C-alpha cells in the first residue's frame, strides 16, 4: 500500500514537471564587470572600463506543434494509472483480509463440529459400556467406540493451530498485534450464510470495473501521447527570449531611466540532422505503444478468465452446498436409526461406527463447502474490481 502511495506521489510530481514547461523560465542576474582592452590589437589606445548591471531574463517555448501538450497528457494518463494501481492494491488487500477471516471462521466451525461429534460419540461410548457391563455385547464394541472417539479428538490440536495461524495472519494484514484482535476473534463465530445468485451486468461494464484494465487502458493512452510528442519533435521549436534590466558605471545611477536595457529575441530552432536520434526516438515510442497495447489485451483476457472462473466456481459451490446439506441430514438420520437398532440388539455396532464416521465427514465437508463458496465469492469480488451492481 505504501509503495502504491509513493508511486502516486511520483506520478503527480512528473505531471507538474511537464506542466511547468507551459510557462516561461525567468531568471535574475546581477553583477559587476571590469574590462580592460588591449592597446596592441587596434589603433585605439588601451582602455579600462567597469559597470554594474541587474536584469531579468526570460525564455519561453511556444508550444506551436503540441510537443509539450502531448507530454503533459501522457503524464496525466500515468498519474491516473497510478491511482488505479492503488485501487487495485486496496481491492487485493480487502480480498486477502476477507479470505483470511473466512478461513478462520471455517476452521472454528470445523472445531465446533468435531467437539459436537465428540460429545455424541462419548454418549455412544457410555451406551456400549453399559451394554458390555450387562453382558449384552463384547468388549470389542467398547474398544471400537473409544477408537472412533479418540480419533475424532486427535484433530482438535491441528484445528487450533490453524486458527491461531489465521488470527496472526489477520493481525499482520490489519497492521495490528495478534494479542489486540485475539479476544475478538477467538470468541468464535459462524460462516456468513450467503447463497444468493449474482448479476454482474454486461461483459464490457464488468471489465471497466477492474482497476488493472482501466490502468492498462490509461497506459496505452499515455504511450500514444508520447508517440505524438516524439513526432512533434521533428517540427520546428519556437522560442521567445528576452531580458529587461539596468546597467551603469556608477552604482548610484543603476536605477535611472537612462540606465535601462532590454532585449526581445524571438527565435526558431529546427533540428535537421541528429545522427538518427529523432528517428529512433519515434521508433522507440511506437514499440512502447505496441507493448502497452499487447499488455492491455493480455490484461483483458486475464480479467475475463478470472471472472468466468470465479462466477462458475461460486455457482457450482452453491449447488454443492445444497447437495451436502441433504447428505448431512441423511447422515444424522442414519446415525439415529442405527443407534436405535443397536440398542434393541437388531443391528451390529459396526453400523453405528460407520454412521458416526460418515456424519463427521459429511458435516466437515459441508463446512468446507460453505467456506469454499464464500472464498469464491471473494474471488468474484476481486475479479470484478471490487464489487458488482445488480
Q: Where in this protein do the model-derived segments appear?
A:
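Sec/SRP-type N-terminal targeting helices
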Residues: 2-3, 19-20, 62-90, 140, ...
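Periplasmic alpha-helical coiled-coil/stalk elements that build and connect Gram-negative outer-membrane
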Residues: 68, 77, 83-202, 313, ...
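Small/polar, glycine/serine/threonine/aspartate-rich low-complexity segments that form flexible
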Residues: 30-57, 180-199, 228, 241-281, ...
Amino acid at each position: 500500500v505504501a509503495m502504491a502511495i509513493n508511486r502516486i506521489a511520483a506520478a503527480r510530481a512528473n505531471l507538474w514537471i511537464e506542466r511547468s514547461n507551459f510557462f516561461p523560465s525567468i531568471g535574475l542576474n546581477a553583477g559587476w564587470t571590469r574590462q580592460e582592452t588591449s592597446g596592441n590589437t587596434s589603433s585605439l589606445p588601451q582602455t579600462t572600463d567597469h559597470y554594474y548591471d541587474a536584469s531579468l531574463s526570460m525564455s519561453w517555448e511556444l508550444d506551436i506543434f503540441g510537443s509539450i501538450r502531448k507530454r503533459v497528457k501522457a503524464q496525466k494518463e500515468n498519474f491516473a494509472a497510478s491511482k488505479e494501481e492503488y485501487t487495485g492494491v486496496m481491492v487485493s488487500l480487502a480480498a486477502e483480509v476477507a479470505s483470511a477471516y473466512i478461513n478462520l471462521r471455517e476452521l472454528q466451525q470445523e472445531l465446533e463440529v468435531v467437539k459436537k461429534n465428540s460429545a455424541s460419540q462419548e454418549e455412544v461410548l457410555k451406551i456400549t459400556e453399559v451394554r458390555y457391563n450387562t453382558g449384552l455385547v463384547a468388549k470389542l464394541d467398547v474398544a471400537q467406540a473409544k477408537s472412533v472417539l479418540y480419533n475424532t479428538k486427535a484433530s482438535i490440536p491441528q484445528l487450533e493451530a490453524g486458527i491461531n495461524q489465521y488470527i496472526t495472519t489477520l493481525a499482520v494484514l490489519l497492521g495490528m498485534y495478534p494479542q489486540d484482535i485475539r479476544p475478538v476473534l477467538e470468541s468464535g463465530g459462524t460462516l456468513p450464510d450467503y447463497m444468493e445468485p449474482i448479476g454482474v451486468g454486461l461483459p464490457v461494464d464488468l471489465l471497466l470495473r477492474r482497476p488493472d484494465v482501466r490502468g492498462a487502458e490509461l497506459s496505452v493512452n499515455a504511450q500514444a501521447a508520447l508517440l505524438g510528442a516524439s513526432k512533434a519533435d521533428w517540427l520546428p521549436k519556437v522560442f521567445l527570449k528576452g531580458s529587461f534590466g539596468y546597467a551603469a558605471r556608477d552604482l548610484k545611477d543603476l536605477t535611472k531611466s537612462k540606465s535601462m536595457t532590454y532585449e526581445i529575441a524571438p527565435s526558431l530552432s529546427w533540428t535537421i540532422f541528429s545522427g538518427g536520434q529523432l528517428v529512433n526516438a519515434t521508433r522507440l515510442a511506437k514499440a512502447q505503444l505496441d507493448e502497452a497495447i499487447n499488455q492491455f489485451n493480455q490484461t483483458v483476457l486475464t480479467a475475463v478468465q478470472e471472472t468466468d472462473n470465479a462466477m462458475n466456481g461460486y455457482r457450482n459451490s452453491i449447488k454443492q452446498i445444497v447437495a451436502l446439506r441433504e447428505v448431512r441430514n441423511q447422515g444424522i438420520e442414519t446415525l439415529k436409526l442405527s443407534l436405535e437398532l443397536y440398542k434393541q440388539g437388531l443391528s451390529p455396532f459396526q453400523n453405528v461406527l460407520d454412521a458416526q464416521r460418515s456424519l463427521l465427514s459429511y458435516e466437515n465437508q459441508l463446512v468446507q463447502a460453505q467456506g469454499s463458496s464464500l472464498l469464491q465469492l471473494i474471488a468474484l469480488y476481486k475479479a470484478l474490481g471490487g464489487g458488482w451492481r445488480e
